[in-house]
Amino acid sequence: DVKFTSPITDHEASDNCGVEILGAEEKIFWKDRKGANINSIRTKKSIKDCDVIIVKFGEKFKQWNAAFDAGYAAALNKSMIVIHNDDHQHALKEVDGSAAAVASDQKQAFRILKYILEGSLK
C-alpha cells in the first residue's frame, strides 16, 4: 500500500490554522507561532509514520521548511529521496549527502518509488 501525505499547500490555511482554531492574536508573532505549532504536529506525525520521505526543494519560496523536514527525517534515519534542480546542488550538498537518492524532478522520484515497490524500470 502507498499513502502520500504532504504539507498543507493552501498557504492561507496553513498560516491561519492556529488563530482559526485557537483564537485571534494581536501580535503576528503569536499568530504565526500558533499556526506553526499546529502544522508541526501534522508534519512530525507524517515523517515518523513514513517508510520513505520525498523532500522537494522548489523555486517559489525559500526552502527552510523543506530543509528542516529533511534534517528531522535524517535524524529519524528515514529513507529519503530529495528533489531539486542543479541550481540548488551546492547549497544542498549536506542534505543530498544524507539522502538515499537525489532526483532532479518528480518524474525521477516517481520512477524510484516504482522501482522500490514493483522492481520495475518501466
How should each PLM-predicted stretch be described?
Residues 1-122:
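Conserved catalytic or regulatory cores that recognize and/or transform ribose-phosphate-containing ligands
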